[in-house]
């Protein structure tokens, strides 16, 4: 079976190129926070990890489970709020990936504290979100309208502050998606590592 790499968004490089997640094997546990369109929990399981996914949308979990059965991959699914990680013991997760699933989270601090609790120290937490600068300029039927930076989604600085307050250290920031059709980045990818215990 061909191993599918973990993906962080549409039309941007995947983890085979970016190498943000590290090696996964049978001894490692990996968590997908919010089932993404790429169903990264399947890629985690294909790589040999004990894959877990949590999502408040039961339909997404059912779709993930059906695909896992079809591919004969062991994937554990949990229905609930993204911050409800009580199923995982403290310090038990080696990798957490959130592919465009944290955009609408209201209490980001609570979620980050829970992710910090379940992760092993010095392990990666990879977050991808729409790049905050991509929402600055839009066009409507009356002409151009400019949205000030920070009025559409969290800014890069907001992400750094929230992650630092939850005791994560950002060690990589990637601004991806610049192309002939998009002069500004479309996707912001952050890799943070857990500090402390």
Q: What kind of region is each of these model predictions?
A:
Residues 83, 87-96:
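A short acidic, Gly/Pro-enriched loop at the edge of an enzyme's catalytic core
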Residues 166-168, 182-197:
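Core SAM-dependent methyltransferase catalytic element
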Residues 124-151:
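Conserved class I S-adenosyl-L-methionine
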Residues 2-28:
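Conserved alpha-helix/loop element of class I SAM-dependent methyltransferases that forms part
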Residues 152-173:
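Short alpha-helix
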Residues 29-84:
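Class I SAM-dependent methyltransferase SAM/SAH-binding core
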Residues 109-124:
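A short glycine-rich, Lys/Arg-flanked "PGG" loop and its adjoining helix->strand segment in the class I
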Residues 94-109:
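A short SAM/SAH-binding and catalytic strip from SAM-dependent methyltransferases
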